[in-house]
Amino acid sequence: MSHSSHYSPVDSGMVPSSSSTEDHLSPTLSASIVLPAQLNPFAKAYDIPPSSIVQLGWALLLRCHLAIPSPCWSTIDDKTMPRGSDTHALQWESLHLEEGRSISWILQRWEDPSVHWYLSSDQLPGSKSPTLTTMLFLVKEYGLFDPVTPIDPGMGTIIYFYPSDEQPRLHISWNPDVVSSGHAFHLTRSLEHALQTIFLAPSVDIRDVNLFGIWDHQQLLQWNSYCPDPVDRLVQEMFQDVVAATPEASAVAAWDGELNYRELDRLSSRLAGVLQSDFGVVSETIVALCFEKSVWAIVAMLAVVKAGGAFLHIDPQHPPARHQAMIKSTASKLFLCSEQTRDTVVRSVPDCPSLVIHREMFAAQPDHAQQDTVISSGNLGPTNAAYVVCTSGSTGTPKAIVVEHVSLCSSVTAQAKAMDITAGSRVLQYAAYTFDVSIGDIFAALTHGACICIPSNWERAHDLSGAINRLGVNQACLTSTVASLLTPVEVPKLKKLTLGGEPATQQCINMWVDKVALKNIYGPAECTVWCIIQPDVSSGIAVSNIGHAIGARAWIVHPENHDRLMPIGAVGELLIEGPLVARGYLNDPVRTNAVFLAQPPIWLASFGPPPPRSRFYKTGDLARYGPGGALLFEGRKDTQVKLRGQRIELGEVEYRLHQALSDLSPSAAVELVHPKESTAPLLCAFITWDEGIDLDLQPAKPPLSACLTPNARKRFNHTVSLLQTEMERTLPAYMIPGLCIPVHKLPLTTSGKLDRKALRYFCTQHSLAFLSTFENNNVNSPTDGATDSFAAPLETVSPAESTLAQLWAQVLGRKTDSIGRKDNFLSLGGDSLAAMRLVNRAARDAQLTLTVADVFKCPVLADQASLVRPLVQTRNLVPFELMAPGDLQIEDLVAYVAEKCGVLHDQVEDIYPCTPLQDEMMRDSLSGDRTQMGQEVILLAEDLDIPRYLSACARVFQRFPILRTRFVQHSDRLIQVVIRENLGWQRPESLTEYVEADAKEAPALNKPLTRWALTSDSTHCILTMHHSIFDGISLGHILGAIYAVYQSIPLPPDSVSFAAFLAQINEHTSGLSDDSKQFWRSYLRPSPGSGDLPLPIVDSTYRPCANRGTQRLVTFQSGVVPALQQHGLTEATLIRGAWACTLAQLQTSSSTPSDVVFGTILTGRNLHLPGVDALVAPTLTHAPIRIRMSAASNEKPASFLARVQADATAMIPFEHDGMDRIRAIDAQVRAVCDQMQTLLVIQPIPEGLTSASTSPFPGPILSGPRVEAREMRHFHWYGLLVECTLLPTNGFFVRMCYDDKLFSSEDVERLLDDYSQALHELGGGLTEGEEVHLPTERKLDTLTLPGLVAPSGAEDMV
């Protein structure tokens, strides 16, 4: 840098200081600047003190580095503070550096309080920021204050100004704990540059002040000396290299299939040939893909690029209007989809040809083994499009980013090196296909010999740790949000974790640091997935530090002018240069030209010859250079936000919102907000409304009119409902605002723009519970501390209502004050499982009696409160009490069972009856080849303390009596006996041999029903238990208890015993109560033509066994779940009603649907018994379901489903009666039960643990309850079992298990189709209010079933 005679620094060396010995002070480093003698005359010309020139220079620096128009700093003038005084003389100053004004203009008005003013401490911003860590010390005599003495740790930087007629001087001191030496050095240089600008160009406009100097240029020349060359290849060529090198290596390991590289190559080549020959796919042809997580999605992607086209992923969960907009904007001519997504594609774009991809389609296709035979077009090259990805667009239309082969190849080459993806990597593919991260996962792996591991959609949502372990994943790229849902102990084989897609959180980093090779990565989709990485994340690195560029160069430019570089350390817009920058937005030159530079910036030439075909993309992200050139992320310069990893343009949401509002509101705005005490952000829509709230943010004047009148609230709630319905048609769920607030007017800045900061600030001052009341019909608006003056007076509530509201809040995850006495439990999201939790919490925490039946009968809070009664405490049962009176003398009974079990008398801890289902299961095992044994094979962590682990298992074995339970035959019934004994371990040499032999070992009377094994190499634990002593909830508690004991976490006290449970469900008689008999006679009263599957009896001695299975993900169409809640119905009711409709269509007796009867397995935990939800024991119950279909064809779905739910509620008091005792009531009841051929099981998602495979176990579970293929043949005694596992959002996972001697796979697939159709029609009718229309009747002769057994006796039902 050249210096004129007006400004000639002579000394700017940095001087280290000695360390401070005082705890409250921090060590100091400093640098000095000698100012020119002309400083005084220059200041005198403006009639201001010389110190004002220094202050202006520092203000210009702060404005540049912090991107704020009115920086502030503190000053101390030693004229007003004697030596040795404290800092009470500290004063704060600020300067308004408005664009359009010159430096000279500012200096001339230095004393104008609208330009330069003083602030009191209460006018300072509430949060401490870099603007407040600066102090200017005005010293009257050089040497009076030592600039290297330790400084207050609250101050990051102190500038000492020493005025002098001959040689004025500055010393800059900084706290190295707050400001790095490198950053301080650049601050010093920038201050020199700012002062030089003041002296040399006082007429320059503030906006044109450029503090980028020669020192910054030299530093960037060092950091950005290298720009990677493009990888000029096709991505399929890189893939072919791997195929040639390792054809047998695993390429894809998915939940629905595995492929090695040779197989993947051949399948994708075959499909590519079809795309070329049958559909005319050539270069630049865009092919849309619509797949769930599947191996076939990978085949389809590779096939499209091999054929020369570019693929575009469409999310099957997005609304049809979104699909149509994407297809229109990209001019896609073909859809590839799966069988599951076919209906979605046909509904969304019926005019677009589609091809369903599945395994069978390849059998008849020619085998194009060599890629050369597939790609016939000679025009395909690296600059042709490889894929298109759509992101949110501010104009309401998605932006379609076109990425070329050269960009993709350049990106995956850099990504694989930076993320250490090698042939030994097993890479998790978690991200949605519409999220560009998925493309990085897939192609970085497939071009470097790694294996892509793909969990199912259900596993992604509910059992990710289990999927990671089952698939052998050792490397993953996840958002912080998702990574925080896992723990290192759950996934011990995961060795490399990269955080990306959203800013990393310190909590997530702390969890994973030192447990895995942890990296942090950044990249907009326009830069082909990733372009910046922090390769070694540690606790000492700031979460904002995203590292250095990979495959590109990163520059920081002025946010409003990319032809100006920002000084080192200053905040600016991140500009990416390199071959991985995309081509642009498809058919959108306006938006392309706005962010993709047509010409290199003018400063580029000063850094040497530009690289070939280099491209530039303005990210819109704000960043600055940190130590060593690392990039520090600082946020956005526009309205683009990220929510749960999804990129959202607020402008697009606002565009759709305005469309939906039409004439209902003149204006609206959408913002990402963080309500007070809320752990997660959400999208909030602010809608102008005549009776809306006032957003006046003056501290002394809290907002008024916060509570709408009941009438206004009702009208606004109606408007919000219309908005939600309309926006669901055009936007994906993650882009729909989760909160709507009526405002009298939108706040504006002084320049007349929307004041988004004011909107965000308003929400930070109020709780989500309070904000939610504006769109809630509940007139009892809650307060939230800061908003007491808003709330309308609460209605008088009874103590029972108040207590119940608190319990609802705990169960439903809401604030207590957001629940009103007229709210509906089911409408607030409650279901059968939530009702069970509510009942147990009421008994345990409030000593109130409430039943699940009560919850469903009276879901409104006020009505429900009228039903609660004080809890009658369960009496503690003494051992053996349930066996007396009427049995043998206890001493004789104990002697009898001790002899049978081969133990001493005092080892018999307790004896009690069996549940009806326990009896059924055990007798079924004893009568045939169905062992009913369940196995859990657990892979133990390598660093597991084995003795400690064995000790934890032993303690849990003693803690839960059910693990020490045996069955003994006593007279004509089975009883269960708890034995005091120690846990014994088997130590097999071979895991495989043991598991196979153990699975075949049948249970026996008088013997233990659990087996525990640890392989000789201590790598696997095998827990085997008979199904009569555990259920899914119990298994989760058992494994969770082992984990807790191992980690020295105290176990909660036992709240209820199995004996107490049995005392409530057993009458200790051979028959049922009169009430039970009356209920079942009425409930199962036969009607003409009623039954289950109407199939012929081929052999009365044959016992069905469900030994095969198929599965499918079923989603509810948009609006179904809210409609269910509005009608007080549950998803389980819809599932049950749809199955009834499916069975009704198979009736052959008449055109009028008949009644249907089928079996079900229920949790059995609906008793009002405190702690029953945590009971470690089998509480399942087996019962018949009867649904009268004769009137259904004339009913509206809401009425039909309400009847189904009412019947289920009425059954609750009798659900433990047991199938055998129900069948024995009389001949008519038995005849109806004999018609049951199918079993429907609805699995809820339990709180905390969904199954053993998701338990927080010290090691992953390789196989568990969900590995149904092995266990179904032992457990299912029906010919057809339908198991539906509810998902947290919008659907369920259905598995049909069947006897392959009775059903063909085609039959079952058709039944699944019929079932899906019934769900669709019922759900659609529910939202539209139509009558029930059963699917087209299917006659028996259209099925190809070989026959089905109708059991004729109780023994056949067991």
From Swiss-Prot:
SUPFAM superfamilies: Acetyl-CoA synthetase-like, ACP-like, CoA-dependent acyltransferases. One of its GO terms (molecular function) is ligase activity. InterPro entries: AA_adenyl_dom, ACP-like_sf, AMP-bd_C_sf, AMP-binding_CS, AMP-dep_synth/lig_dom, ANL_N_sf, CAT-like_dom_sf, Condensatn. Residues 795-872 form the Carrier domain. PROSITE patterns: AMP_BINDING (PS00455), CARRIER (PS50075), PHOSPHOPANTETHEINE (PS00012). Signal peptide: none annotated. It catalyses: restrictinol + glycine + H(+) = restricticin + H2O. Keywords: Ligase, Phosphopantetheine, Phosphoprotein. Residues 1-23 are annotated as: Disordered. The modification O-(pantetheine 4'-phosphoryl)serine is found at S832. Residues 261-659 are annotated as: Adenylation. Residues 909-1322 are annotated as: Condensation. Nonribosomal peptide synthetase; part of the gene cluster that mediates the biosynthesis of the tetrahydropyranyl antifungal agent restricticin that acts as an inhibitor of CYP51 and blocks the ergosterol biosynthesis. Within the pathway, rstn8 catalyzes the C3 esterification of restrictinol with glycine to yield restricticin. Rstn8 represents an example of the emerging class of single-module NRPS-like enzymes that perform esterification reactions. Rstn8 displays strict substrate specificity toward glycine as no other natural amino acid is accepted. PANTHER family: FATTY ACID SYNTHASE, NONRIBOSOMAL PEPTIDE SYNTHETASE. NCBIfam families: AA-adenyl-dom. This is Nonribosomal peptide synthetase rstn8. The lineage of its organism: Eukaryota, Fungi, Dikarya, Ascomycota, Pezizomycotina.
